[in-house]
UniProtKB/Swiss-Prot annotation:
Pfam families membership: RecX_HTH2, RecX_HTH3
Family (UniProt): Belongs to the RecX family.
Swiss-Prot/TrEMBL keywords: Cytoplasm
One GO CC annotation: cytoplasm
Principal location listed in the UniProt entry: cytoplasm
Record's protein name: Regulatory protein RecX
Protein task: Modulates RecA activity.
The keyword Cytoplasm is assigned to this record: yes
Subcellular location, record wording: Cytoplasm
GO biological process: regulation of DNA repair
Gene3D superfamilies assigned: Winged helix-like DNA-binding domain superfamily/Winged helix DNA-binding domain
Length: 269
């Protein structure tokens, strides 16, 4: 049987000196001191010491976790990682901390996911697939986030957000791209932001975009000048026209417009 010989208050913890035990001194938080009525001359067995140290891991873990979540909402996985990074290494005690905080609704992955999704919808910047990937990196389970997305981010809302993004892209690139290029860019951009092809297509169709023939031809002639310079160095005649036609078609210009432009085009020498 050992005995507590001294207790000293430090900045954050208490140093407890022991005699006749394997440990000569231990460091405990105030919660542990109070919970076990730690006082000088109190007798402590090795079994008592193990219990005290186990509880202290829980108490310190809970204190750290409460500090961590005081700034903003955190997921259970984020809190677990934070505790491990701050030397709370007893996994059983970590899970107990998470259990207590979850029971008191201080950690709620579903609420976290719902708030995150609503924020992204409000910002109008992300589709469901992008949101899902971000939440997965925060340790939220696939089941929890799938349920939250289903409840909050309906297809109707997705189309509304995608439409606003598509409209903005149309205003930005409308005069710089052909109609085909613009449509391709809008679809690709929306899918990169996490919208399905189906939702992206519906949003695009809702814009009812039409070609500006004069702008299309201006863009064609501008691109024709660039392509002609490149291919005139190594090709001539029919082969050159074929190379140029193929290059312009890949950029979204129609074969009829390309043929019309080439008919009276003067190639650089």
């Amino acid at each position: 049987m050992g005995k507590i010989t001294a207790i000293k208050k430090l900045k954050r913890l208490y140093r407890v000196d022991l005699s006749d035990l394997d440990e000569e001194k231990i460091y405990l938080c105030e919660d542990t001191i109070i919970h076990f009525f730690i006082t000088i001359d109190k007798e402590v067995s090795e079994t008592d010491l193990e219990e005290i140290l186990a509880y202290d891991q829980f108490a310190q873990g809970k204190s750290l976790a409460l500090y961590y979540i005081s700034f903003k909402m955190r997921t259970g996985a984020e809190v677990r990682k934070y505790l491990l990074e701050h030397d709370i290494n007893d996994t059983d005690q970590i899970e107990q901390v998470l259990s207590v905080l979850t029971e008191n609704n201080l950690i709620n992955d579903k609420s976290y996911a719902e708030n995150f999704i609503e924020g992204k919808i409000s910002m109008g910047s992300s589709g469901p697939y992008q949101i899902k990937q971000k939440l997965l990196t925060k340790g939220i389970s696939n089941d929890v986030l799938s349920e939250a997305l289903k409840e909050i981010y309906s297809e109707e809302k997705q189309i509304d957000v995608a439409y606003k993004l598509a409209s903005k892209l149309s205003r930005t690139y409308g005069t710089r791209l052909t109609l085909k290029q613009l449509k391709d860019k809008i679809i690709q951009n929306l899918m990169n932001k996490g919208f399905s092809y189906s939702v992206s297509s519906i949003a695009l169709d809702s814009l009812e975009l039409e070609a500006d023939e004069e702008n299309e031809m201006d863009l064609l002639y501008s691109e024709l000048d660039k392509v002609a310079k490149r291919y005139t160095k190594n090709y001539e005649g029919y082969e050159r026209k074929q190379k140029i036609t193929q290059a312009l078609a890949r950029k979204g210009f129609s074969y009829d417009d390309i043929s019309s432009a080439l008919r009276d085009y003067t190639f650089p020498e």
